[in-house]
């Protein structure tokens, strides 16, 4: 399966509390085999699943069993520890979407396991259709609670449309382009590129530079001032956090629970690098 990691980047670790963005597909599952991710752990983060096409079966150690479909949010909170599996369904022919992570702040990074499913209604504005899965935009507010102020929305722009959105000036924003190209302010973004806008903007103008519709995902949030370490499926504050999480998973600790109903073994953790993984944050703010 074709996967493009757009966050973190060398120049930027986080956008708000968004710390990870994988953009995958579109893939013909008859050729690629689709998605079959065995049970694996998470800690210190929330996962956000958002599909453009296809269908994924989600199971987790909380006991959740849910289908992820286009236009539907699945938000899973790892906190101290959770495990889950992800498998594309037999009905899926084309698999296409984004997998996003949100770093939990220190005060809540050991939050209890949780799973939320939400189907946002599409909002029509001049030149675009908006689906707000987290936060608020275009007059719509997601009911899904987050641990830090966040925005997550799919925006589909009509051909050659220019749309000016009112946004929270205390947020920084990232625009992931799925189809385009799309211009955000003065920056032209091609498909699979992620653009960045700093705090201080109360509007963002998006312009579809193509003759077809353009799909984008707008992410935002207040700057996340904590430094984090991120390795495999874990987020911590220092290397020791990663070592302990890995040991707990390898030892089948109750920390991550067990996923029922998956046909197969769980994923073993890879070996840690020989070097100490140092905490990372964004460049100093000007």
Residue ranges and their predicted role:
Residues 1-286:
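Jelly-roll (double-stranded beta-helix
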């Amino acid at each position: 399966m074709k996967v493009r990691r757009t966050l973190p980047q060398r120049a930027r670790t986080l956008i708000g509390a968004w710390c990870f963005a994988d953009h995958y597909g579109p893939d013909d599952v008859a050729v690629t085999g689709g998605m079959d991710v065995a049970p694996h752990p998470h800690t210190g983060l929330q996962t956000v699943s958002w599909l453009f096409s296809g269908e994924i079966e989600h199971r987790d150690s909380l006991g959740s069993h849910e289908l992820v479909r286009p236009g539907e949010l699945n938000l899973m909170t790892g906190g101290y520890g959770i495990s889950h599996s992800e498998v594309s369904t037999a009905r899926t022919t084309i698999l296409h979407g984004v997998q996003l992570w949100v770093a939990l702040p220190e005060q809540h990074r050991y939050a209890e396991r949780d799973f939320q499913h939400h189907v946002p209604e599409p909002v029509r504005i001049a030149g675009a259709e908006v689906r707000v899965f987290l936060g608020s935009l275009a007059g719509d507010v997601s009911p899904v609670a987050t641990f830090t102020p966040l925005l997550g929305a799919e925006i589909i722009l009509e051909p050659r449309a220019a749309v000016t959105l009112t946004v929270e000036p205390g947020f920084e924003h990232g625009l992931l382009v799925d189809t385009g190209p799309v211009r955000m302010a003065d920056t032209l973004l091609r498909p699979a590129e992620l653009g960045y806008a700093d705090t201080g903007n109360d509007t963002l103008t998006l312009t579809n530079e193509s003759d077809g519709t353009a799909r984008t995902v707008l992410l935002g949030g207040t700057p996340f001032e904590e430094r984090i370490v991120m390795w495999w499926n874990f987020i911590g504050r220092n290397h020791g956090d990663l070592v302990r999480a890995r040991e707990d998973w390898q030892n089948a600790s109750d920390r991550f629970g067990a996923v029922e109903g998956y046909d197969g073994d769980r994923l073993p953790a890879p070996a840690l690098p020989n070097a100490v993984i140092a905490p990372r944050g964004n460049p100093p703010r000007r």
